[in-house]
Amino acid sequence: MTTKRKPYVRPMTSTWWKKLPFYRFYMLREGTAVPAVWFSIELIFGLFALKNGPDAWAGFVDFLQNPVIVIINLITLAAALLHTKTWFELAPKAANIIVKDEKMGPEPIIKSLWAVTVVATIVILFVALYW
């Protein structure tokens, strides 16, 4: 049996996300995927350049020294830091940690995640620069 009734479909404009600051920040956070894709492609090209010998690697390093690429990489770094910040703020909401019959607040978890990130960054930089 078919019906002639038309269901109500609420109109949705293409600018729905511009109405509230929460939605704008949501779109910004989701947009951090684009710089992540850029960095992934750049890293893959770097690996292929490393595999193809010193001349290819020198060309890749020259490419990285282009001022436009430096600016794009700084934007990518900012996007990665924003994504990391929002992810670390989300992590305590997913973990229900109880210490001495009280639920632990989000601050210790967020601070420990940042501490691990800083330590890992320092170790990686030390190995890359001085090993």
From Swiss-Prot:
**Positions of transmembrane segments:** 30-50, 63-83, 109-129
Q: Which UniProt keywords apply?
A: Cell inner membrane, Cell membrane, Membrane, Transmembrane, Transmembrane helix
Q: What does the record say about its membrane topology?
A: Multi-pass membrane protein
| Family matches, as Pfam families | Fumarate_red_C
Q: How does it assemble?
A: Part of an enzyme complex containing four subunits: a flavoprotein (FrdA), an iron-sulfur protein (FrdB), and two hydrophobic anchor proteins (FrdC and FrdD).
Q: Which GO cellular component does the record give, naming just one? A: fumarate reductase complex
Give the protein family.
Belongs to the FrdC family.
- Sample GO molecular function, one term: succinate dehydrogenase activity
Main location per UniProt? membrane
Protein name, please? Fumarate reductase subunit C
Q: Where in the cell is it found?
A: Cell inner membrane
Q: What does this protein do?
A: Two distinct, membrane-bound, FAD-containing enzymes are responsible for the catalysis of fumarate and succinate interconversion; fumarate reductase is used in anaerobic growth, and succinate dehydrogenase is used in aerobic growth. Anchors the catalytic components of the fumarate reductase complex to the cell inner membrane, binds quinones.
- Species whose genome carries this gene: Shigella boydii serotype 4 (strain Sb227)
* InterPro entries associated with the record: Fumarate_red_C (IPR003510), SQR/QFR_C/D (IPR034804)
